[in-house]
Amino acid sequence: MSDKRQDYISWDEYFMAVAKLAGMRSKDPNTQVGACIVSEDNKILSMGYNGFPRGCSDNEFPWAREGEMLDTKYVYTVHSELNAILNFRGGSLEGAKLYVSLFPCNECAKAIIQSGIRTVIYDCDKYSGTDPVIASKKMLDAAGVKYRKYEPTNRELIITV
């Protein structure tokens, strides 16, 4: 009888890697965010990434970050967390975990809370001092949704496709 392999990746590494891989589908030239929703028994339920709604051309809608509001991406983009929630096609997300590469904004926090997701594991919190993230944390705390920073292992995962 042989011993099992010891260098397999942890659940956290696996799901955060899946979230980051999903983010690689984003066509946003500045910000690629991915999300992966996982059941209490570690089954992937849904994934999402930031981008425009279905039917809204990536070539016709703006990717700009500055300018008149209607000439920027901000009023058109669906965030990865909301896409993952909307992409879920079965049952309930009650008790699920959300792995996401960037801390959720206030609008995504509302959807997270309403969907029943109970835990958020995030990689980056670079907007922590902004009103949307402060509001997000306030709502998540009030609703009893736990959140924690992903602890990177700096393990290099190489995938050839």
Give residue spans per PLM region.
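Zinc-dependent deaminase catalytic domain
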Residues: M1-V161
